[in-house]
């Protein structure tokens, strides 16, 4: 029982081993074991040991009877591996049929499959009875075969050579041409790689040997990243040009930094110049050496004879018979150097022996014949004499003519030169033609042989002092090869085959290097290589089967820049011009080019437009509307051709504008009969003989230009606003307007309409400076004339008034002959005589200030010493500080009040003024007064006495009236009548007004009329002063204390004459200033009332002080003089008008005067010296057109 069980166990083990052998033989890689179960039982039955059947190896699948089991296993393994490729091909074919378009097929794979099929067929034939066919079909391959690189190259080469020659393209290309083009990647791809996987980060962690090139490549990637980012930045800014010009290298800098690696045109010129200089220098040396050699040859010929001549071989012509002896003799003559000269003469070789050098006789003949030398080949067939070797060819011709017997003369007739006396010269002999053989007797040549020369140490072959030729053997081998390879020219060769290429072609530039004239060292034209290239059919198959399809090639596949670009419209034109557009005509070839360029340049419309334009943009020529190809017109035509276009396809910054433009164009086309959109026509639709309707577009362009001019004129006439009209009307009678003939500074055109060119600005500045200079000269002339006329009238009036004492004056000037009150008025009204007219805002009489405000407009606001403008709060604080200071001055000095004109302005006070007053600002202008005459300094100093009270020095207002001597008035003012003195600006304004109204009058007549008018004004003022003197003093004092309601007959209130400010047009800052000024006025009124209450007490205290000072010119207990009262009223009115004038300047009712200076805060009027509603009285208020005729600068 135990034995039976052991036998069954052994049998089972045997069967399991046999089953394993079966699986290994059928499927060595054991891919699918379950498929072989049906064959196991059959195999075990065939090898059942119970039936006395022994195991046979050949029964295994794949094992033949003659082979071993190991060979069968190796064949089975290779078979299963090749089946992998076969299965892969099957799956790829199935994928292509399903639409995936994936197929990889190569020649090597086909050969492998053929081999596997052969082996499988052999295996199936060997064991057809034992193993079924399903076993080989069920096996599934797993891995490709593992082969070395050498084996793969060998298989590919063998497959390439076994391919049919019809599938290949045979190319013959020069040897130095590259066979395969280099791989090129786009900048975007390189930038992406540098940002994702930069080499500079991968190199430190690499596990291979690194060399310098790896790090240089990493640095190059960094440079590419910087370059790409910079290009993208320039593209966003619109600064990246479509065409990149060649970089310019400065010759000096580039050569200095790069050691002359790059040559320029200038360098080529220098090199050619150096070469030519060397060539000329060596050429002159060569000529000198030739001359020396020739002279030496002549000397040797006459010294040693014919032995120094070169032997020449006789020339045998066609038809002549040459005997062998003569030929042999000639050869001996040429080859043997030691031939005898007499033998040479016997064979008539001496006729052939002629020296190559120029003999002495020939030199004489050359001189005689005026350097006319002609060389002729010497022929041996003509008999010649021995002397002909020394005769010039021209003389030989003359000798042949003279051999005529009729012209020959006997030799006896010739008289020797020795017998001819100087006193008797035969003219016939001079006129007769001489014979050289008679006159020139050649000397006998010496006869030397070669042996004689050798004995003397001379050689006939090497007699030249210099070497004038180059021997080929003396050169180097490279130079010899160059000379030997130079092309040779023969007369009867084929020109096309043997003639070398021309050194210079007509299309080449004239500057050619010297080496260009030589034959090239490397003859590339002779060496070509044969390149076998795959045909188009195989290339299409390989493209289909190489890798995934186009849409699966990743981010940087083939033409990836075209796949991921979206439609970016250019900037559209203005929508308002849609109705006036003319359509563009597009021919079929234009559409074809447009589609091609759109695909080529990826919706870069500017570049597409450049390529579609008929000519370059730099060529200025007329281009009709229908021929233009702007970026927008190209885009419009493209979307017209694209039937699938939608607004959602547009991306970019102009997408919204382009969509709105297209919508407006569609609506305009539906309402307009004329076509607006582009028109595509065929070649047959274009009219004949018109150049694309260019004539029609010419008329259209002319019509548009005419319409544009008419529209411009209409806009110019209707664009003027009421503010411009008012400004122009204000400036109509200005001096500049009257001189230039223009309606005003605006000329009916706003500044924002047109920007003047630099030439126009320069012209305007020149005209303005010229008009200012003329106006200044006219003012000076008029002022001098008016001062003389006024001085003359004053003298006449003083004579009529009687004995009126005149106080001493500070110096000569325009105040000479004018009483002290009038000097004070001049100091208040006139100001410095040399100040510009634009700075007279605070020196002009009150009635003239509104007119200047109308002309000058709003001045600049008060500024700090640094030039910055004060704010409204700072101005209010300064006004309060000034108010407090004036109150303190009135309390500390009760005898000197701000409104009392009775305080004298003594010369001592004028002298004690600071020296810096010579350069103080007058009316806001920084004009130094140091260079002015004494009269001008007095006037400016008298006015500055008024302005000192507003500064931070807390100075009291100093009246400008001069003290009188010997008068009984308590105020120190004489009892004469008050007079008025006009400023130069007022006089010039009056003259300009008269000249404008009467242009036909001359300057003298205008001056006389102005003088008469001023005299009338002064007379009226005097009459008013006389009426005021007759009134009792109580009325004057009452007039002073009337306050805001004061008004007298014959006077006009200034607020009624002034223009009310337009509050609606004020800025918030100006409104704050206006409120501040109103508050200051209220404070002034309150302060004025307080001052009027204290006036009586102040007068009493002043009288007491005058009594204590006996030397004082003031007389105590004297009532107020009427003149002083009138002056006090005048000061009040003046200060009020100054304040009003500054208010109007801040409100900005009028235009600015060019050149007017900024008033300082110190030039503001005193806030406590006037009433806002006080009346105005002055002779200047009656001037004609006084509000328009103040000249401006």
Swiss-Prot record:
Residues 253-332 form the HSA domain. Residues 92-147, 368-414, 716-756, 787-867, 885-976, 1020-1193 are annotated as: Disordered. Residues 99-113 have a biased composition (Basic and acidic residues). One of its GO terms (cellular component) is nucleus. GO terms for biological process: chromatin organization; DNA repair. Residues 805-822 have a biased composition (Pro residues). Residues 586-642 form the Myb-like domain. Residues 389-405 have a biased composition (Acidic residues). The keyword DNA repair applies. Residues 726-745, 831-844, 899-934, 1064-1075, 1140-1161, 1182-1193 have a biased composition (Polar residues). It is found in: Nucleus. One of its GO terms (molecular function) is chromatin binding. Keywords: Activator, Chromatin regulator, DNA damage, DNA repair, Nucleus, Transcription, Transcription regulation. Residues 118-132, 792-803, 845-855, 935-974, 1020-1035, 1051-1062, 1084-1107, 1163-1181 have a biased composition (Low complexity). Its main location: nucleus. Component of the NuA4 histone acetyltransferase complex. Belongs to the EAF1 family. Component of the NuA4 histone acetyltransferase complex which is involved in transcriptional activation of selected genes principally by acetylation of nucleosomal histone H4 and H2A. The NuA4 complex is also involved in DNA repair. This is Chromatin modification-related protein EAF1. It comes from Debaryomyces hansenii (strain ATCC 36239 / CBS 767 / BCRC 21394 / JCM 1990 / NBRC 0083 / IGC 2968). The gene is EAF1.
